[in-house]
């Protein structure tokens, strides 16, 4: 069995889930207003699939029951999504102020866009939250081999957004453009891959999973590949 020292009980667990959701939503909203290289780094750290997915995995890891792992991880993502889009709707109001080709207001189109994206990410939260929560719980509460499988799947999925970005726009090509803006894009892509691998290393050390390294490598590679395809499909939905 792996280390079980990380579990939390109510009410501390509920408070921590709510605090994590608030932090995710606020930081993601703040990252949108940062320009340049710093902006790309902020987005990679606070408003990426890695950042939000890791929060869900950790919510599952610290739960004391499987059911709470599911509800906690899903709650983090749902609450953060709602807060983020509420801030866009009420504070930044970046959906408003534009005009159509005929000179009329584009506010309704902007509101529809916010509504659609809110629905898409809420659906994603409801699908990804339970899975990531269960993976986090399995890392802590299962045998070494099964914990290694869960850790590899989790971190492979967390790195998928970065791999998808690298496939779409390889960082070496971006760096060759010699533009500081694209330097930031390239750095953000790399961060989205390096940090999930660092998280995997931490889980391996914390739960002594090194003996199951073949399982770790295979599950990480398979999950990263599957996750990259899912991000590609999501891009098609967003562009439709």
Per-region residue spans from a language model:
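Alpha-helical transmembrane segments of multipass membrane proteins
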Residues: 24, 28, 79-84, 128, ...
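Hydrophobic secondary-structure block in the mid-to-C-terminal portion of proteins
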Residues: 160-225
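Alpha-helical transmembrane segments of polytopic membrane proteins
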Residues: 41-53, 109-127, 181-196
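N-terminal topogenic module of multi-pass integral membrane proteins
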Residues: 1-94, 103-107, 111
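Cytoplasmic membrane-interface segments at the C-terminal ends of transmembrane helices
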Residues: 3-13, 58-71, 130-149, 200-217
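Central hydrophobic cores of alpha-helical transmembrane segments
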Residues: 71-80, 150-157, 213-226
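Juxtamembrane boundary at the C-terminal end of a transmembrane helix
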Residues: 228-240
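Membrane-proximal helix-loop-helix units in multi-pass membrane proteins
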Residues: 86-175
């Amino acid at each position: 069995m792996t280390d079980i020292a990380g579990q939390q009980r109510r009410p501390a667990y509920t408070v921590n889930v709510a605090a994590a959701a608030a932090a995710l939503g606020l930081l993601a909203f703040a990252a949108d207003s940062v320009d340049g290289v710093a902006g790309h780094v902020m987005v990679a750290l606070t408003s990426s699939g890695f950042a939000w997915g890791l929060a869900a995995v950790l919510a599952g890891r610290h739960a004391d029951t499987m059911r709470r792992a599911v509800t906690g991880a899903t709650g983090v993502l749902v609450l953060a999504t709602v807060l983020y889009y509420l801030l866009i709707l009420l504070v930044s109001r970046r959906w408003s102020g534009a005009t159509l080709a005929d000179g009329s207001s584009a506010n309704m189109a902007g509101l529809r866009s916010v509504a659609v994206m809110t629905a898409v990410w809420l659906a994603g939260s409801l699908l990804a939250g339970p899975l990531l929560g269960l993976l986090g719980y399995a890392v802590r509460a299962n045998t070494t081999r099964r914990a290694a499988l869960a850790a590899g799947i989790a971190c492979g999925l967390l790195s998928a957004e970065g791999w998808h970005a690298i496939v779409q726009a390889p960082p070496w090509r971006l760096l060759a453009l010699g533009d500081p803006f694209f330097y930031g894009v390239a750095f953000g892509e790399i961060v989205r891959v390096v940090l999930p691998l660092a998280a995997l290393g931490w889980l391996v050390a914390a739960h002594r999973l090194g003996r199951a390294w073949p399982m770790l490598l295979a599950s990480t590679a398979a999950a990263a590949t599957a996750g990259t395809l899912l991000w590609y499909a999501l891009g098609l939905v967003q562009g439709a």
